[in-house]
Amino acid sequence: MEPPPAPGPERLFDSHRLPSDGFLLLALLLYAPVGLCLLVLRLFLGLHVFLVSCALPDSVLRRFVVRTMCAVLGLVARQEDSGLRDHRVRVLISNHVTPFDHNIVNLLTTCSTPLLNSPPSFVCWSRGFMEMDRRVELVESLKKFCASTRLPPTPLLLFPEEEATNGREGLLRFSSWPFSIQDVVQPLTLQVQRPLVSVTVSDASWVSELLWSLFVPFTVYQVRWLHPIRRQLGEENEEFALRVQQLVAKELGQIGTRLTPADKAEHMKRQRHPRLRPQSVQSSFPSPPSPSSDVQLTILAQRVKEVLPHVPLNVIQRDLARTGCVDLTITNLLEGAVAFMPEDVTEGSQSLPTASAPKFPSSGLVTPQPTALTFAKSSWARQESLQERKQALYEYARRRFRERQAQEAE
């Protein structure tokens, strides 16, 4: 039985906070006056929680008091299988759902989390992050931190995904640097539930996430501890990260994907891309004047067909009508986002890039040559090779389209 296909970025990230269901939207409107009152009240209570957490030293008493006060704020922290927690392990690995995951885990056990891509500041400290130096020195600093002999030892809580997801469908690819710190890590799973609205939105700031957390009746964070995992003999950091990712995904009932934070940024960019309107044409590839939008669509589809001759014309037209952009259509066809039955390419048609020279040398652009077709030893390496080939095909198809446009303009 084949494994289920990995979910795309549109299933890993929520773009809308409000529910689409009419009944839930009505319930949210009725709850709004109560939620606003709770928000104002909890803002004042939250200030007291912050002062208490700063005044009390790190201890079991402090965690109990702050955890109780956070429950009043609507942030409920629960844990399962706490007996599996090994206090000798210095690196904790978790999936990432909200900007406050590290605060919730810190209510259950002592831990420190570095803030990536941000300089040390008061905001960094007030949010409960560990202040570190530049990203270049991060790994070495964390290794020294874990190697310290201070008692009791403070473990590191790291999020290898580096970006938050909606916590429902799958996990982002785990970065390898958290697994280069020590040879033993203890993973944990984090599930977040919240009524009426989405738990997190892809382009929201931590301030807006905090306000929504104080607005809703409650947000439940469920932490489940897993057994510590040791690096196998000769196992690379990437393979270690992939093994832990698959274990965490299995415990969550989700799928470990190969998507990265860069894919999230690209997905957000596509969401902001304007759709095709009847009276407008795309700015990237100007179309010749035509009497109707249908004729324009046919002309653009025919040009894409010349670049990708194995794709049926009706498939190209359908995706162009949906995206309104040649760039996105070529990307979807090359990445397999659009299902189709390939057509037989005639002998006179051009194929995709090979080791031969490009047909249009006058453009001054160098066509990337695909790498040798070797079968990598690890699944991670095979996936990386596939991504490189897909990117090369995409750039080649895009370049051919531009060159045909330039020739017709001349």
UniProtKB/Swiss-Prot annotation:
Phosphothreonine modified-residue sites: T367
Keyword entries, A-Z: Acetylation, Endoplasmic reticulum, Lipid droplet, Membrane, Phosphoprotein, Ubl conjugation
Database matches in SUPFAM superfamilies: Glycerol-3-phosphate (1)-acyltransferase (SSF69593)
Location of Phosphoserine modifications: S292, S363
UniProt xrefs under Gene3D superfamilies: DNA helicase RuvA subunit, C-terminal domain (1.10.8.10)
Record region (Disordered): 259-293, 348-367
GO biological process: ERAD pathway; lipid droplet formation; lipid droplet organization; lipophagy; protein localization to lipid droplet; response to virus; retrograde protein transport, ER to cytosol
Annotated membrane topology: Peripheral membrane protein
UniProt record similarity statement: Belongs to the AUP1 family.
Protein's job: Plays a role in the translocation of terminally misfolded proteins from the endoplasmic reticulum lumen to the cytoplasm and their degradation by the proteasome. Plays a role in lipid droplet formation. Induces lipid droplet clustering. Recruits ubiquitin-conjugating enzyme UBE2G2 to lipid droplets which facilitates its interaction with ubiquitin ligases AMFR/gp78 and RNF139/TRC8, leading to sterol-induced ubiquitination of HMGCR and its subsequent proteasomal degradation. Also required for the degradation of INSIG1, SREBF1 and SREBF2.
Identification of the protein by name: Lipid droplet-regulating VLDL assembly factor AUP1
Species in which this protein is naturally found: Rattus norvegicus (Rat)
